[in-house]
């Protein structure tokens, strides 16, 4: 995947201890926007100094999951975005696999990973690499086609 096709958005609230594993799992050339739901200037300075690929936005207050992610997504200039929780980390081929799925589907809004450790019909009976439709996704990692996602109006902040 070309690094100019994807931006990673990480919405945080006092996640100083958790976020380093997450950011260390991201390629240094990959653009990352961290939305910190506080006014912690020290956190912003430290994170931007340590990770040259990271832009940190301070909100001044806790906006929550939907509004914080929408703020981060409003700054994205790439075709795709990956919403990632600060306590999640990427495996080596995660971004490549998301892009492969995106190229297969084309008009998707959101793609999410299937977790092998959760019991579900798909985990037990389907090919692990198969793409299938679900009614909902876990919010810890969501790959967005921003053209389609904008059409549905981003995350509901209500």
Spans of features found by a protein language model:
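Short, well-formed alpha-helical segments that are part of the catalytic scaffolds
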Residues: 12-28
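A conserved acidic beta->alpha catalytic loop
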Residues: 25, 36-44
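Short beta-strand/loop segment that forms part of the nucleotide-sugar
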Residues: 30-39, 57-59
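Glycine-rich, basic loop-to-helix element that forms the pyrophosphate-binding segment
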Residues: 58-76
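Short aromatic/hydrophobic "clamp" motif used to bind/position activated sugar donors
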Residues: 81
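Conserved donor NDP-sugar-binding/catalytic core segment of glycosyltransferases
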Residues: 92-123
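A recurrent flexible, glycine/aromatic-enriched loop bordering the glycosyltransferase active site
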Residues: 127-147, 151
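Donor nucleotide-sugar recognition loop
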Residues: 150-158
């Amino acid at each position: 995947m070309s690094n100019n096709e994807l931006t990673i958005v990480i919405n945080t609230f006092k996640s100083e201890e958790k976020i380093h594993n997450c950011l260390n799992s991201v390629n240094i050339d990959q653009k990352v926007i961290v939305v910190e739901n506080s006014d912690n200037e020290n956190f912003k300075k430290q994170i931007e100094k340590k990770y040259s690929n990271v832009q940190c936005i301070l909100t001044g207050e806790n906006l929550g999951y939907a509004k914080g992610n929408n703020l981060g997504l409003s700054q994205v200039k790439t075709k795709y975005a990956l919403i990632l929780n600060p306590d999640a980390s990427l495996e080596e081929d995660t971004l490549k696999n998301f892009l492969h799925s995106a190229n297969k589907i084309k008009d998707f809004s959101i793609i999410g990973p299937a977790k092998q450790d959760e019991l579900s019909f798909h985990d037990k009976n389907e090919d692990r690499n198969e793409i299938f439709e679900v009614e909902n996704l876990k919010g810890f990692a969501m790959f967005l086609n921003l053209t389609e996602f904008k059409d549905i109006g981003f995350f509901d902040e209500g």
